C-alpha cells in the first residue's frame, strides 16, 4: 500500500485531539461512558467544594481539594484525549479518501450501447440503473458493472496500488469503483448505487466512525465496568457514616478521590480508543471493515476457509504436459485442447495455447474467422470449450467431463482414469479434454505452493484455528496439495453450494468461520460466513455480501485480518487485567490515609511508607490520571501479538499485565509521593 501511513503522534493530530478532548467535557459526551461520567461528576463536585472553601462558605483545605479537583479533570481529559486521538487518526484516513471524490460530469447514455446518444450530467445526479460511457482519462463517476468494453483502470486512489488493472464486461472482473481513473480504451457502465451509497462513501462513513456502534464484547465489558462502578460507589457511600460514627468523619473530597481510584478508570478511559484503533489498524492493512463487530469476530474466528489458488499456491497454474488416451495421437489432443482454450483468458487457458504452440507448432487461429461458438466456464458446469464445424470440444474437471460423456452415451476410459490419478498424485491438476463423447486425454496443470505458508498454518494451529483448503480440484490433487501445504482439511471439487453447506456445518458445531471470495457465485457463502473478506477486484454482489473488503484483492490477507482481530481482543483483555490489578496498590495508598485517624490499626496497610495522608491520596489520584496517558500508545498500537494457544496466551498476559498491574502502581505512587514531598505540596 503506497498510501502514506500516519505516525502514532502526528503534531497536527495531537493539536486536533486536544481540542476535541476539551469539547468532549460536556455532560452529553461523558454520559456515553458511565465510568468516566462518575469521574466527571466527581470533578464537578470537588470544583464546587474548592470554590466554596476559597470563598469561606465551608471549612477545609482549598489547596488540597483544588489539586484533587484539577487531577480529576485531567483524568477525564486524558480519557477524552485517547478517544479523540484514535478518532482523529481515523478521520485523517477518511480525509485522504475524500480527496478521491471529485466533482465531475458523466456521459449518461440514452441506450446501453457505447455509440448511443449521450447527455453530459453532473455525476451527483446519476441514479442506480443509469448507463454511462467512460473514456480514457475520465474518472469513473459511480460504482457499477461493466456491460460493454474493456479498459485499463488506475485504482491507486482507492487501493494505494500503482499497477493498473483490467476491467471488462463479463466474468468476475466487471466491477468498477467510483473515483478510479480510466487509463486506456473505454467502458460502458451500469450504475449499481445511488449518490451517497457508493463504496467510497461507505468507506468514508466507516472510517470516520463518529457514531460507531459498540461490539458485543465491548457491551459485555461495559456492563462489567458499570457493575464494578456501582459496587464501589455504594461501598464508598457507606464509609462516611462509619467514619463519622468513629468520631472523625472523612471529607467528601477524600471519598471522591477514593471512589475514582477504586473504579476501573484505566480501561474505562481507553475502551473506546481500543475499538476505534482496531478498525484503523485494519484500514492500515488496506482492509475496509463495515463495522467493529466484523473486526471483533475476526479475533474469535476458529475456522479459516482458504481458496487454494492465490492463497495457498502461487495461482499461476501452467499447462505442463499433454497425456493422450489410448489410441489418440498427442498432437490431436493438443489441437483440441488449444481450440477449446482460444477464448479462455485465464492463465491456465493461455498456457494451454502456448504449450500446444511450443510442442507442435500449432499457431493460434483467428478467433473471428472460425465462426465458432465458445462455451464459457461456469462454477456449475465446471468446464468450457468450443462448438465448431459440427465438433463439440470441451475441457474441464474429471467429474464434469465424466457426466458430459455419459450423458452423451459415451464411456469414460479406464486408462484416462489412471492418467488422471497419476497426475493428481503428483500434486498437479488434471483437466480432461473430450470431443463429443470421445475422451481425448488429460492436460496436466502444475501449481507451486507458496513459500512459508506451511509455517503460517502451523502457527494458526497453535492458536486453535483450523485451516480448510477450498479447491475445484479432484480429491487426489487436493489431498496432495493439502499435505504439502500443511492445512488441516480440504474441500475438493467445491461448488458454491458445497461451500455454503460446509460453512453451515461448522457454524452448527459452534465455530466461527472466515473466508474470502470475489465472484457472484461466492456471495451466498460470504453472506453466511462470520468474517467474509470480499476482494475489491471482485463483483459488486461479492462486495455487498462480505463484511470486509480487501483493497489489495489478496486472498492471503485473511490470515492478517485474523491477527488484527485477535490483537484487538488481546489489547482489550490485557488492559482490563492491568486496570483491575492496579486497583490493589491504590487500596494500600488511600484506605490507610483516609481512615487511619479513625482506625489507627489501618496504618499497618501503609506498606509503601507514604509521607502523609494528603500525599498518599494525591499520589494515588495523580497516578490514576497519568497511567491513562502512558497506556495510550499501547491502546492505539495494540499489545505485542504472538501466535500462541489460548491457555499460553492467558498465562503470558496474566504475568505481564496482571503482575505488571500490581507492581507498577506501587512504584509509581511511591515516586509521586516523594516528588510531592520534595515540592512541599504534601
From Swiss-Prot:
Coiled coil: none annotated. CDD domains: P-type_ATPase_K. One of its GO terms (biological process) is potassium ion transmembrane transport. ATP binds at residues 344, 348, 377-384, 395. It is an enzyme of class 7 (translocase). One of its GO terms (molecular function) is ATP binding. InterPro entries: ATPase_P-typ_cyto_dom_N (IPR023299), ATPase_P-typ_P_site (IPR018303), ATPase_P-typ_TM_dom_sf (IPR023298), ATPase_P-typ_transduc_dom_A_sf (IPR008250), HAD-like_sf (IPR036412), HAD_sf (IPR023214), P-type_ATPase_bsu_IA (IPR006391), P_typ_ATPase (IPR001757). Signal peptide: none annotated. Keywords: ATP-binding, Cell inner membrane, Cell membrane, Ion transport, Magnesium, Membrane, Metal-binding, Nucleotide-binding, Phosphoprotein, Potassium, Potassium transport, Translocase, Transmembrane, Transmembrane helix, Transport. GO terms for cellular component: plasma membrane; potassium ion-transporting ATPase complex; potassium:proton antiporter complex. It catalyses: K(+)(out) + ATP + H2O = K(+)(in) + ADP + phosphate + H(+). Its EC number is 7.2.2.6. PROSITE patterns: ATPASE_E1_E2. Mg(2+) binds at residues 518, 522. It is a multi-pass membrane protein. The active site is at residue 307. The chain crosses the membrane at residues 34-54, 58-78, 219-239, 254-274, 588-608, 616-636, 662-682. It is found in: Cell inner membrane. Part of the high-affinity ATP-driven potassium transport (or Kdp) system, which catalyzes the hydrolysis of ATP coupled with the electrogenic transport of potassium into the cytoplasm. This subunit is responsible for energy coupling to the transport system and for the release of the potassium ions to the cytoplasm. PANTHER family: POTASSIUM-TRANSPORTING ATPASE ATP-BINDING SUBUNIT. The system is composed of three essential subunits: KdpA, KdpB and KdpC. Belongs to the cation transport ATPase (P-type) (TC 3.A.3) family. Type IA subfamily. This is Potassium-transporting ATPase ATP-binding subunit. It comes from Salmonella typhimurium (strain LT2 / SGSC1412 / ATCC 700720).
